[in-house]
Amino acid sequence: MDSINKIINFLFPLLTLYALLVFYPTYQRLKSAVSICRNLFSENVAGKVVVITGAASGIGEALAYEYGKRGAYLALVDIRGEPLFHVAALAELYGSPEVLPLVADVSKLQDCERFIRATVLHFGRLDHLVTNAGVAPLYFFADIEDVSKASPAMDINFWGSVYCTFFASPYLKKFRGRIVVIASGCGYIASPRLSFYCASKAAVIAFYETLRTEFGSDIGVTIVAPGIVDSEMSRGKFMTKDGKLVVDKELRDVQMSVLPVESAERCAKAIMRSVCRGDRYLLEPDWIGCVILLKVFCSEATEWVARWLLIARPKFPMMEALSNKILDVAHAFNSFFSFPHY
């Protein structure tokens, strides 16, 4: 077997280069033709039944309104009841024929079975599943005292998606539906303090890429990798090393610095267009793709830059990180050049 591997090691790079030179241009032309057809004959979701998890805020909320505008029936899921009912009422005002709000915890297997079953019993079908619920643990791995407190990242971000998909897939297959996976650019790009978040999103991407191969044409899978989108997370709501959700704006400033925050509405519109076209992937905004390319071809440099920007020198406080100093300069610049409005 070792000799076979040696032969493959020699031949495969040559065959790969040949394939790229000969077949890649044709492949891209075919992709362009398919993309044009998908734009011309995009899916009409009016009258279809859509389940959205994490629908009480952020991308999930904005997607509920986008689906509502297009006339879809909605089953909205979130662990927070009051904001969920508010979103459900607004989604109906936006045009959804009927909205079913369901309070549930996606990290619990029984809850996922319950809300999928309730959706199918109520509407009689299921066409789209949007797995959006997630939390963002934000701390250094070395600071953890009890590693079991890190489990919510996988329980919610990964297993929450898996559980929903397990119970929804028979119905999605029956109606040739689609799974819309809200992953993250962090699933491709490592970032200090986000080890568990990055790991959970990378697992989500790998899981659904594998499922797409298994499902074939029976169930479509669109994997979305957003950048920083206006949400509770982008406003500083993170999970601590003790497993508690807190708002820490100072930590938010260090971690996100001057990176642009995209509105949830803009992101949801891009996702909606991508879903209706039947896209396999969506990187939103587009510059996320450039960062991923830099990581692939200059991985050492991107890791060094992330550490240089986001981690303060030893024995210095967190706020001494270069990312926070850049933000301070940006604030000072804005204050200096701002003019009163009359």
Swiss-Prot record:
Active site: 197
Major subcellular location class: membrane
EC number assigned by the record: 1.1.1.-
Chain residues that bind NADP(+): 54-80, 105, 197-201
TM spans (from-to): 10-30
Gene Ontology CC entries for this record: membrane
KW Acyltransferase (keyword) present: no
EC top class named in words: oxidoreductase
The keyword Oxidoreductase is assigned to this record: yes
Topology with respect to the bilayer: Single-pass type II membrane protein
Keywords, sorted A to Z: Lipid biosynthesis, Lipid metabolism, Membrane, NADP, Oxidoreductase, Signal-anchor, Steroid biosynthesis, Transmembrane, Transmembrane helix
InterPro entries tied to this protein: NAD(P)-bd_dom_sf (IPR036291), Sc_DH/Rdtase_CS (IPR020904), SDR_fam (IPR002347)
A GO molecular function held by the record: oxidoreductase activity
Subcellular location: Membrane
One record GO biological process: steroid biosynthetic process
Residues bound to substrate: 184
PANTHER family membership: 11-BETA-HYDROXYSTEROID DEHYDROGENASE-LIKE 6, RETINOL DEHYDROGENASE-RELATED
Membership in a protein family: Belongs to the short-chain dehydrogenases/reductases (SDR) family.
Name recorded for this polypeptide: 11-beta-hydroxysteroid dehydrogenase-like 6
Species of provenance: Arabidopsis thaliana (Mouse-ear cress)
